[in-house]
Design a protein with these regions (language model features):
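Beta-lactam-recognizing serine transpeptidase/beta-lactamase-like catalytic domain environment
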Residues: 2-3, 7, 16-31, 41, ...
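Active/ligand-binding-proximal structured segments within catalytic/core domains
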Residues: 46-55
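Short, gly/Ser/Thr-rich active-site loops of penicillin-recognizing serine hydrolases
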Residues: 273-309
């Protein structure tokens, strides 16, 4: 989509990063800026891994969004607050209660450790470890708070957030670039996730991140539509990473954005959220949210193909 692509290019500017925009009701990639980085083997997901961990804990019935989790002798926190403020201790506690096998099982269910795209040339895999990292490095707790030991790609994160945005369908992402390919586009379902009842438990925290939490910098540039998202900030071997994954919840449909930054300062999650706000602003100013092609309503019917890789 030329409107989305130009909006992303203008917002990213000279930052070393990539932007992936996805139509969550089909898995169609609307724009992919800096394809080399977008299709690379990925990076530590930082705090965006908390989305997967939260869904795992909700699926296992360990928590609801209001369940207080003890983080000390006198301090308790619920999921909504923990997501909004990206509280590491909360997700470390969840990870240890779940254990590595369940954490890994759900991460794979949501698409980590496997190709997110369908016949996208040059796409690399990312990596999810076969066992927990050593306790001296933080064990499963650090895997669940910072994504320590995990390598996630922007496409994998885009596919997972698209499944959250659409109610539980994990699509293969596809990137049609020719007009005839766009006209003949057919969504391909990877699998159905049993998360529809859990999404309301998750969405308050994702909305809170933008309204008052770690992603509130987005609202410096855009406040016309509801945005739900999750930031991530960390560093690995001297390289800083900044992530922000989100979706716009509009009256005519939804669109997913993943912003990934890599390098030195100011590379961190709130900066990625600020850039996402500029992208949404640019799209809004070009009437994308009024009648944008490629933004079908949630009730639209699309033909899909179930595909086995």
């Amino acid at each position: 989509d030329p409107v989305v692509r130009q909006a992303a290019i203008d917002a990213l500017g000279n930052m070393n990063g990539t932007v992936v925009a996805v139509e969550p009701t089909s898995g169609r990639i609307l724009a992919m800026v800096n394809q080399k980085l977008a299709l690379s083997s990925g990076a530590q997901p930082c705090s965006t891994i908390k989305l997967s961990v939260a869904l795992a804990a909700l699926s296992e019935g360990l928590i609801s969004k209001e369940t207080p989790v003890a983080l000390g002798r006198r301090y308790r926190m619920n999921l909504t607050t923990a997501l909004a403020h990206s509280n590491n201790a909360y997700f470390e506690a969840l990870g240890r209660r779940l254990g590595f096998e369940k954490v890994a099982y759900y991460a794979h269910e949501y698409g980590l450790g496997e190709l997110a795209g369908y016949n996208i040339a040059g796409e690399q895999l990312g990596a999810y470890p076969e066992q927990a990292i050593p306790e001296k490095l933080g064990g499963v707790g650090k895997m669940c708070s910072f994504g320590e030991g995990v390598s996630m790609t922007p496409l994998q994160l885009g596919a997972m957030v698209s499944a959250i945005a659409n109610g539980g369908t994990l699509y293969y992402l596809q990137h049609p670039t020719k007009p005839e390919d766009v006209a003949d586009f057919q969504p391909r379902v990877k699998r159905q996730l049993d998360i529809a009842p859990l999404i309301p438990e998750l969405s308050d925290g994702m909305s809170g991140a933008v309204r008052f939490g770690t992603a509130r910098s987005l609202r410096l540039n855009f406040n016309e539509e509801e945005i739900l998202g999750k930031t991530g900030t960390c560093s690995h071997e001297g390289t800083r990473y900044g992530w922000f994954a989100s979706y716009a919840n509009t009256s005519i449909g939804r669109v997913v954005l993943v912003v990934f930054l890599q390098g030195g300062r100011p590379t961190f999650g709130p900066k990625a959220a600020e850039i996402a706000g500029r992208i949404y602003r640019n799209m809004y100013d070009h009437n994308f949210f009024i009648a944008g092609p490629g933004l079908p309503s949630d009730t639209a019917t699309v033909n899909t193909v179930s595909t086995t890789p």
